[in-house]
Amino acid sequence: MSRLIDEIKKYKEAFKIKAPQEVQDKMLEATKKLEDSSISKHALTVGFQAKDFNLSNAIGNEVSLSKTLEENDFAVVSFYRGVWCAYCNFELKALQGINEELKQLGAKLIAISPQSPDASMTTKEKNELEFEVLSDNENKIAKEYGLVFSLAEELRPIYLSFGIDIPASNKDDSYEIPMPATYVINKNKEIIFSFIDEDYTKRCEPQDILEAIKKNS
């Protein structure tokens, strides 16, 4: 069992112990509704051309997919919900764990969320990330990738009770967030690997990313 799966399993077990059952039931029901809606069917996946982007990083410098692919053989793009999401933090730390190997394979790692640059900086510092963390204002790029949905209204007060204020984090009152997704994109901007799941507790295994790149090198 990988370290990422281990971390997620441990966190979920702890959450089941401490969270009220009513809260757990509402969260599970919302995830089930999202899965039943099959919104992931509308997302870009393997074989599609990746949408270009030009987004600000945590210190305000712009990073583009085109420029990244001019300088690297592959781009690994991870869409995440925000620093407030424990599962996202587990995943980002796991990605940091393979960052050096990705560089050796000619791949550049980029993470994207709808958070403001300040929140992106918090993400970068909290998780000690050495790769780019970009701000996708109003989920403009995530929408082009077909990943965006609105957080269920019944979950909003629950999230606030956890101290999670999505509008404040995103500087946007829409409550729109992306499904977590991971893409490996080659020099031709073709998506050669993708992981997308409506269940935000399920995340891409870092080893799968490495294997996809090695297979296409």
Task: Give, region by region, the residue ranges found by the protein language model.
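A short, polar/charged loop-to-alpha-helix boundary motif
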Residues: 198-216
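Residue-level recognition of short loop/turn positions
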Residues: 59-60, 188
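Short active-site neighborhood of thiol/selenol oxidoreductases, capturing the structured segment around
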Residues: 66-95
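Thiol/selenol-based redox catalytic cores and closely related redox-interacting motifs
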Residues: 136-202
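Alpha-helix-centered segments that form part of catalytic cores
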Residues: 33-44, 49-52, 165-183
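N-terminal targeting signals for export/organelle localization
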Residues: 1-51
